[in-house]
Regions:
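N-terminal beta-loop-helix "entrance" segment that forms/cooperates
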Residues: 34-51
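Short internal beta-strands
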Residues: 30-36, 116-118
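Phosphate-bearing ligand-interacting subdomains
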Residues: 54, 59, 65-90, 101-103
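Short, well-ordered, mixed-charge alpha-helical segments that flank or form enzyme active sites
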Residues: 76-78, 98-101, 122-127
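Conserved small/polar residues in nucleotide/adenosyl-binding loops
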Residues: 138-143
């Protein structure tokens, strides 16, 4: 059997950058907000290097914390909470996802109603929704 790997196989540049960022900052006081990527092997390797995962900033009790935002991004309130606690913030969000955050915020500010269609609990969708800042916005969809 012959196996051919496409020239573009592997992680996309946004994920690759997020992993490199986590490795760069790995250590005793390093946390990621959620899984930096969806890959258990990589997450295990980062954990062995001292990177801890949290689902909520309130889980961190470390005045020297460095918090890395996952490649999928996070809502504005997460960034605000990290800054309010005085933690060092490292944003490893994929640039394409950051662009979506800016677009959502721009159109929300212009008074548009933003509808996000996707897997409602996926971290990327949750993060995008977190830039709407309006209670009538809804995440719609299933896996």
């Amino acid at each position: 059997m012959k196996i051919i790997l496409g020239k573009n196989g592997g992680f996309c540049f946004g994920v690759r950058s997020a992993v490199e960022t986590a490795e760069k900052y790995a250590g005793e006081h390093t946390y990621t907000y959620g899984d930096i990527i969806h890959n258990d092997r990589v997450l295990d390797e980062l954990a062995q290097k001292g990177v801890r995962r949290v689902d909520s900033i309130s889980e961190i009790d470390d005045e020297n914390a460095t918090v890395i935002i996952r490649s999928h991004g996070a809502g504005r309130k997460v960034y605000d909470e990290i800054r309010a606690k005085g933690y060092k913030l490292i944003d490893a969000t994929c640039p394409f996802v950051k662009k979506i955050h800016r677009i959502v915020r721009e159109y929300r500010d212009k008074g548009y109603h933003v509808f996000i269609i996707g897997a409602s609990e996926h971290p990327e969708v949750v993060g995008i929704n977190g830039w709407c800042d309006r209670s009538e916005e809804r995440r719609v969809g299933k896996e």
